[in-house]
Structures are given as structure tokens and as C-alpha cells.
């Protein structure tokens, strides 16, 4: 059974005890996880009252241990977008399993106006939590033109089967630039962990 929660969210702040990177709008992200037994869904507007939808959904599903990391990763992946998120976790023992959020986003900014998708995952590892986020966004320009929009200090890290891979400046994760005709799909990946 899927529970639906409709909540509006505006600007968000990452939890201060978590170590994750801020990603610039051009840096966009995908992580795969097994299906959960419990789910929640929210519609979120980019310019509404501040709330933390990711933390709220995790709490409603019984996730306590990794709720802060999940929320910080979710806020990072959806930064600057209106979005809808569906959150899933593993049934009755939710706090002992990973929590996953699948995010559909719409950007309407001066530098990027399009749809994007993201996935955030946080899971207990020993006494702490670790997580990942991925955001995927298409750009209507060639990848060689998108490279200049990567964060300052970004460096080429080689290629994976011909797909360019970049280490993002400021320790913000990695980005793959996938050419698709005259367009470029940017896939950004970042990791996070509890630090306190």
C-alpha cells in the first residue's frame, strides 16, 4: 500500500551533522536499489513554505537512524527544483534497512529549464549511515559546451566506454556527460555519510 503525503517545500538547508557536497545546478544525478514494502509520496513546489519533505516521509515510514542523512541527500538532489518524491523502505523493520527516494524534478532557472530525475538512498552501516544520490538531467546543447558549467576545479577522470567522467571541484562527487545527438545528458553521483 502506498501512502500519499502532499507537502510544499521551499529553500532547504542540509543537516549540520552530515557530510555531503552542495551540487551546482548543472551537476545532475541515479542509484538503483531493491524495491521496498512501504512507500510515501509528496508533491513539492520550489517556492513554498520551508519544510523537510524527505525527513517527514522517512519519519512517517518509521525511519529514524538515517532520516537526517536521507533528508540532506534529498535536499541536495532537488535543490532549486519543483519536485515530487516517492519514498520507500523495508516494511515493519524500516529503521534497520535502507530508505530510498525517487525524485521527479522540474527546473525553471535562468541557466536550466527542463525536467530531471534523481534517486537518493541512505542505509545504516554499523552505528552510522551512508548514502548516495544521483541526478540525471538532459541539456539541449553539446557536452563540450556543458563542461564549462561544471564547478570550478573539476577535472577529467578518464572515460567509461567512451563516456567522459569528471571529478567535480570542491569534492562534490563525479559527473558523466552522455552525448545524445546534439544534446548532453549529465549524470551526477555523490556520496554522503554521518560524521557525528
Predicted regions located by residue number:
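N-terminal secretory signal peptides that target proteins for export/translocation
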Residues: 1-20
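Sec/Tat signal peptide C-region and signal peptidase I cleavage site
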Residues: 35-41
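Long, charged/polar, surface-exposed segments that mediate recognition or autoinhibition
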Residues: 110-162
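Short, solvent-exposed mixed-charge patches
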Residues: 194-196
Amino acid at each position: 500500500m502506498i501512502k500519499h503525503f502532499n507537502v510544499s517545500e521551499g529553500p532547504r538547508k542540509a543537516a549540520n551533522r552530515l557530510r555531503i557536497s552542495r551540487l551546482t545546478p548543472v551537476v545532475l544525478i541515479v542509484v538503483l536499489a531493491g524495491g521496498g514494502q512501504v512507500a510515501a509520496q509528496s508533491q513539492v513546489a520550489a517556492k513554498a513554505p520551508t519544510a523537510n519533505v524527505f525527513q517527514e516521509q522517512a519519519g512517517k515510514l518509521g525511519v529514524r537512524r538515517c532520516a537526517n542523512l536521507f533528508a540532506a541527500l534529498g535536499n541536495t538532489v532537488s535543490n532549486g527544483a519543483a519536485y515530487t518524491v516517492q519514498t520507500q523502505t523495508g516494511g515493519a523493520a524500516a529503521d534497520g534497512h535502507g530508505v530510498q527516494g525517487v525524485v521527479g524534478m522540474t527546473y525553471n532557472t535562468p541557466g536550466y529549464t527542463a525536467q530531471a530525475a534523481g534517486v537518493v538512498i541512505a542505509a545504516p552501516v554499523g552505528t552510522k549511515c551512508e548514502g548516495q544520490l544521483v541526478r540525471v538531467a538532459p541539456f539541449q546543447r553539446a557536452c563540450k559546451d556543458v563542461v564549462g558549467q561544471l564547478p570550478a576545479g573539476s577535472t577529467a577522470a578518464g572515460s567509461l566506454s567512451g563516456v567522459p567522467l569528471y571529478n567535480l571541484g570542491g569534492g562534490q562527487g563525479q559527473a558523466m556527460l552522455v552525448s545524445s545527438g546534439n544534446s548532453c545528458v549529465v549524470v551526477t553521483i555523490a556520496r554522503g555519510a554521518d560524521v557525528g
